[in-house]
């Protein structure tokens, strides 16, 4: 049974169709990659799923509940958390306060000493054990990504949406990031990720959905999809297919 189901999503901006009838499903515990060249509609699709944008048409289902058209904060409380392509941390707050904000926002509203202990555990989980009282704006870009992940995990999501979370990492950081995502998967978390690092996609993802010009170009298991001529052509041009 699918945990996340996207049916016929459409979104246009000033007559330009950014997402054109996109449909796919993700099962419990699966890691699915949403791929495509720059401008293919991937982040717009993720914004539609998370409620950051309202779709012109189509439906999004979380389990048996429609989350179509709900505002982002309600979708987050129902169990869909995300990170962003351009990192969004609360720069004037400490790392632990950023994570505590996520804890306060979820359904069981954690506050006080219990929330602090859980926030420290989440910071430790993403590799920020010694940064609890550091202002978020003082972190490196990579550590801000880790903080954003900790804040998303504070919501105890059913589905985690990662928008290029592995981008910009050096080889050592990339392997650490892949390991972290694998650990989340072993804990039963369902993950949809946008990624251009193909080594990470091959290492992590069960299936791929490839977009081009807003529409779905291909879907299937990772190895076979990445070998398809039309997918290679979408990324590199027809002469390389």
Locate each region found by the language model:
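Glycine-rich phosphate-binding loops of nucleotide-dependent enzymes
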Residues: 2-241
